[in-house]
Design a protein with these regions (language model features):
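Domain-scale activation on soluble regions of proteins
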Residues: 35, 161, 468, 479, ...
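Trp/Phe/Arg-rich N-terminal binding region typifying the photolyase-homology
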Residues: 1-79
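Short alpha-helical segments and helix-capping/turn motifs at coil-helix boundaries
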Residues: 24-31, 127-128, 192-200, 274-276, ...
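Conserved catalytic-core segments centered on acid/base and nucleophilic motifs
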Residues: 29-44, 197-200, 204-206, 274-291
Length: 492
């Protein structure tokens, strides 16, 4: 079935409170998707972000980001006043997220809502906590301990609790009980609000495409609570960390720093943790994009403490053994494999054996020196085509920066030599939509024709990433009609 969708992170939704969330603006965006004939809404990972604000680095692979909890909903329940919500300082630029101000203001309001609630006597809250015993108590205690330790990584905590000695764990559970309850409350409220957004999307015929990073952060509840899942030494320090080797784009490679999985242990336990993780993802989403799919075939291991990725080496991943177990235990799932970058024959074979659709990004297609696999005439139906992803420039910004040679290839392929410069992004959108790919997803910024100022992320940089927000009323009626006509024209 041919289908079309838009890519827009939850954080990038309009909001009067500094960052997008599960507010009326989320419901309005779903209405827009329906009006324009879309069937999919792709978002980025929903976890609570750490330093750098990347959704791909989170304090937990199971937890949700409290920033997305709608304050107006809490006010409607009588747990906050509208005045308190409006009085907080969220920054003064509706096009960008000021994470520093959000951090300083949001948790004050959320704590106030918790103290004003009677959540601990709510049966639904109790049921939620029971249903999530495999991760929620550890996460809540981890966050409470992190606060008590002034935000330090768990590796810097006192040895007894760092190594989770049973007496220390029991002591801090009692000592920090109220703070633990607060973090459980946040997860309950996150889940309740997100479930309603997802249900509304289903009413409108929209499916949610979620995103799952292959790795977890070292400074996370996952690593602290489950060190046996990872390649750690007797002090729970990593033996090796994740990244990518040197290539034409980087002489020293990429050093991500995530702990690597102890795949022998995962196999011995029947991949129990992975089954729980993937099942939980499909509770949150309808379709799941798995990031860095090639890491399940082979993963790059860099010695812990190295400052670059130069001394890394490749190790074998679980391959189809993991995905056969997933299919056996969870059934056939709607998974998208992120298979971008340099791939070996064994990765292609893993993708073929899994049956999952891979990704095609048109911004990678127009190299005059090679016949790119990203050119649309090479597509099989079982793939997902994008003009660009969150890691790419916007299409308008990309056109601006293309070399003369690449631009000529792109314009020739799209037959766009006579298209006005300010309209060229539409030619790339049309190229994606009319391709044979079953699924087509377009970033919102491309439909809006925005330049590099609206780019979500510049990989391997810190500072101005993950900040862009769509402004209220960005889609005119004329623009919505144009998208609807194109979607219908190309059978999506």
């Amino acid at each position: 079935m041919r289908r079309n969708g838009m890519l827009l992170p939850i954080a990038s939704l309009p909001s009067p409170y500094g960052i997008g969330g599960f507010s009326k603006e989320a419901y309005e965006f779903i209405d827009l998707l329906e009006e324009t004939g879309q069937k999919l809404w792709q978002i980025l990972p929903l976890g609570p972000t750490i330093y750098g604000d990347s959704p791909y680095q989170s304090f937990s692979t199971f937890a949700g980001n409290p920033y997305f909890i709608d304050l107006d909903t809490l006010a409607e329940k009588g747990w906050l006043t509208k005045e308190a919500c409006e009085a907080s300082d969220y920054g003064d630029n509706e096009s960008y997220i000021d994470y520093g101000r959000i951090y300083n203001s949001r948790f004050v309001l959320l704590k106030q809502a918790f103290l004003n609630s009677d959540i601990l006597s709510d049966e639904k809250f109790t049921e939620f906590c029971k249903a999530n015993q495999h991760w929620l108590p550890d996460y809540a205690l981890y966050m409470a301990l992190k606060n008590q330790n002034d935000g330090k990584s768990w590796i810097e905590w006192e040895e007894e609790i760092r190594l989770r000695k049973p007496e220390a764990v029991e002591y801090y559970k009692k000592e920090l009980e109220e703070e633990c309850n607060f973090y459980e409350f946040l997860q309950y409220e996150f889940h309740e609000q997100w479930t309603k957004v997802k249900e509304y999307a289903h009413e409108k015929g929209i499916q949610i495409v979620g995103d799952v990073p292959i790795y977890v952060a070292f400074d996370s509840a996952d690593t602290w609570a489950n060190p046996e899942l990872f390649q750690l030494d007797e002090k729970n320090l990593p033996l090796g960390v994740a990244g990518c080797p040197p290539d034409a784009f980087s002489a020293t490679g990429q050093l991500w720093g995530n702990p690597l999985y102890n795949w022998a242990y995962h196999k011995k336990t029947g991949y129990d943790w992975w089954l729980k993780r993937i099942a939980y993802c499909f509770d949150l989403y309808d379709i799941v994009r798995i990031d860095h799919f090639r890491g399940f075939d082979e993963y790059y291991s860099i010695p812990y403490g190295d400052e670059t990725a130069v001394n890394g080496h490749w190790e074998k991943g679980p391959g189809m053994d993991l995905f056969n177990t997933v299919k056996e235990k969870l059934g056939e799932l709607d998974i998208i494999a992120e298979d971008l970058g340099f791939l070996t024959e064994s990765v292609f074979q893993l993708l073929k054996d899994s049956g999952y659709p891979g990704m095609k990004v048109l911004q990678f297609a127009f190299d005059p020196s090679e016949d790119s696999d990203y050119l649309t005439y090479k597509y099989q139906r079982n793939c997902v085509v994008y003009t660009g992803t969150h890691d790419n420039d916007t299409t308008a910004g990309w056109f601006e920066k293309l070399s003369d040679g690449d631009k000529e290839v792109a314009l020739r392929y799209m037959n766009s030599f006579y298209t006005p410069k300010e309209e060229q992004h539409w030619d790339l959108i049309a190229l994606a939509m009319r391709s044979t790919a079953d699924t087509c997803i377009i970033p919102v910024q491309d439909f809006l024709g925005l330049g590099s100022e609206a780019r979500i992320n510049m990989p391997s940089t810190l500072g101005d990433n993950w900040k862009w927000r769509m402004t209220k009323g960005a889609f005119s009626e004329e623009l919505k009609e144009k998208i609807r006509r194109m979607t219908k024209l190309y059978g999506r």
